[in-house]
């Protein structure tokens, strides 16, 4: 109700709302064995329920952008963040649903960003993600530059991240064979063939 009231107030006092950028996050990292309903609820409510409320409250608005900040963890996982990954997977589903309705939606599965946000306060998580990806996290300036390109492309889902494909493929053996990473695997093999040839 609060989100609907806010959107209604904006409609009365401002020019038409053109876009939504949902970047809320809540963390309650726990190993799967230690997850409980309260932990799941806290993380899902902030990310997924918040996004759903924005979706419903803006259905009558002439939006050109509806951007949801997700995480690379939906593609590669991260120990202790099952609730966070689940919430972000929900955002990906919401973006797909909106696009199927002919509404704008882009879900950005950000890779680690070194100098802004959560990872600046959580070195252990930053180091774990960098190890899984095989590269240093993105710089905030680089992420903002990529955001401009993402908006221009109108993609449904993108995952901007620095990663080393051989490192990632070793940690996720199914990635080397699976359809989800097929284009990356193909490009890596093609680049290797060109280098060797």
Q: Predicted segment positions?
A:
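4′-phosphopantetheine-dependent carrier domains
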Residues: 1-179, 186-197
């Amino acid at each position: 109700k609060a989100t609907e009231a806010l959107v209604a107030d904006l409609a009365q006092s401002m020019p038409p709302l053109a876009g939504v950028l949902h970047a809320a996050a809540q963390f309650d990292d726990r190993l799967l064995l230690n997850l409980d309903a309260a932990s799941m609820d806290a993380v899902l409510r902030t990310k997924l329920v918040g996004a759903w409320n924005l979706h419903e409250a803006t259905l009558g608005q002439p939006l050109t952008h509806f951007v949801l900040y997700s995480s690379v963890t939906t593609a590669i996982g991260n120990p202790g963040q099952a609730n966070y990954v689940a919430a972000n997977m929900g955002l990906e589903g919401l973006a797909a649903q909106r696009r199927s309705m002919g509404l704008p939606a882009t879900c950005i599965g950000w890779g680690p960003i070194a100098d802004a946000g959560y990872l600046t306060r959580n070195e252990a998580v930053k180091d774990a993600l960098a190890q899984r990806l095989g590269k240093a996290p993105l710089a905030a300036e680089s992420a903002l530059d990529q955001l401009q390109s993402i908006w221009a492309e109108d993609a449904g889902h993108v995952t901007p991240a620095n990663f080393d494909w051989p490192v990632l493929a070793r940690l996720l053996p199914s990635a080397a064979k699976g359809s989800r990473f097929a284009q990356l695997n193909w490009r890596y093999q093609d680049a290797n063939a060109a280098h060797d040839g």
